[in-house]
């Protein structure tokens, strides 16, 4: 087989970011009910996102109908692309989904957060043909050097979305249905009534700062909280900072004087 470089395409080993849907039970009725409950408050949040089904948390001897789980995820508008399984879980290929390898970007939490669901995107690797060119070295920065802070000084209305490769500063209101996303920190010097997602590539040190917190959803590194879990009175509508501590969102009053 010739490895001569083609001017028309490249085929190489690589990695892509995707969500992991970790299955912890074989009770598909309970799983379906919980999935619907989680998504009914924010049906658009994961719409069209790719997801890998992770069955490594199942006990020895347990198995699930992956075709049914695949359909469940499709029903909430997610796109299953593969399965992550242990070597002993040979049944995981029965649904026709490819087996993938996953490298979690953080150690697994000892206990799930009471008010947030971890959905951080690990790197999922798919094997490919030998590359004609070298691939990036492991540990290389995933974000270009010298990324500048993005400043938005206009109101964001329902349906609008802003994405920042680094930090994001917003100087005007974020309305219901609007979404602001950053790979770094988010600063909002106005009311936040839409969705704010910081550290979206797994940056657990990212924070959200806001002078008036009234959000539909807040998220750091994929750990999120929605309006189905009302905010305490001491932070609702107030100046706050939001950070992660042991897989839990901490929302703290921000005293500016």
Curated annotation (Swiss-Prot):
Residues of the region (Disordered) are 123-144
Disulfide bond positions: none
Is Ligase one of the keywords UniProt gives this record?
no
The answer, when asked if Cell cycle is one of the entry's keywords, is yes
Q: Which UniProt keywords apply?
A: Cell cycle, Cell division, Septation
GO biological process terms, semicolon-separated: cell morphogenesis; division septum assembly; regulation of cell division; regulation of cell septum assembly
UniProt-listed InterPro entries: CAP/MinC_C, MinC, MinC_C_sf, MinC_N, Septum_form_inhib_MinC_C
Q: Where is the composition biased (Low complexity)?
A: 123-141
Pfam families linked: MinC_C, MinC_N
Q: Tell me, what does this protein do in biology?
A: Cell division inhibitor that blocks the formation of polar Z ring septums. Rapidly oscillates between the poles of the cell to destabilize FtsZ filaments that have formed before they mature into polar Z rings. Prevents FtsZ polymerization.
Q: Which family does it belong to?
A: Belongs to the MinC family.
Q: How does it assemble?
A: Interacts with MinD and FtsZ.
Q: Which HAMAP family match?
A: MinC
What PANTHER family does this protein's entry cite?
A: SEPTUM SITE-DETERMINING PROTEIN MINC
Q: Report the protein name in the record.
A: Probable septum site-determining protein MinC
- Gene coding for it: minC
